[in-house]
C-alpha cells in the first residue's frame, strides 16, 4: 500500500538548538496515526513542517494527496457565521460545498449563529468542516476534542472513524492518551527531537515491559501500586494490610493505560 506521508531525515533547528534530529517515519494510507510528545519534544515543529507551515533545515517530506488542517484554535472573525466561513473556504479551494458533509457535522443547525456565539463543541465541528472542504486525502487534527463534554467527544470520534472508513488518512495530535488509544492504528513518540517509538499501542506495551497496576480501596483511602509480578505483590500487600488490621473495601487490577506506558518511556528517555 502506498504511504500517505513519508518523512525522511527531517532536521530543524532554532539557532544552536536542534529541535528535530533527523527523524524518519511513514504514515500508511487510510490509517489514523498519532504523533505524541511532551512539551519541547519537537512534536509541534514536526507537524508544522509536514503541514507546510514551517520551513525545515534538511530532509524530505512527501504527502501523497491533498491536505486538510483542523487547528486547535481559529482566527475566524468573531461575527462571521458558519455558512459564510464555509462559502469562503469553498471559494478559496475552488470547489463545491458538500452538503452531506455539513449535515453530518451539524453545521446547518448552527448556520444562523455568529462564530462568537458558538460553543466549544460547535467550533470544533466547524473547524473540522472547514478542514474537509475540497475533499482532502490527508487530514491533520490538532487536539480535536479539547474542551468538549463526553457527548461531544463521542460524536467527534464517530466523525473521525467515518473519515477513516472513507479511506482518509488522519494525523492526530492529542494530549488525551485514552483518545489516542481508542482511535489510532499506530502512534509515534517524539523524545528530545528523535523518534523514540513508532508502532501500535500493544507494541508500546511490549517495548516498555508489561506492568500491572493494583488499585486498593480501604477505609483510610485509595492507593495504587505498580508491579511486574502481580501475584507476589498482591499477596505481600494483603498480608501487610491484614497485619495492620486495615479493612479492604475493593481491589482492582489492570494492565496499565497508554498514558502510563507513555510516561514510562519518557522516564527512560528512550
Q: What are these model-derived regions, one by one?
A:
Residues 51:
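Helix-to-loop junction immediately C-terminal to a conserved catalytic motif
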Residues 87, 96-111:
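Conserved ABC ATPase "signature" region
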Residues 139-143:
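Catalytic Walker B motif of ABC-type/P-loop ATPase nucleotide-binding domains
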Residues 198-199:
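ABC ATPase "signature
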Residues 203-270:
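Short, charged/small-residue-rich alpha-helical element at the C-terminal edge
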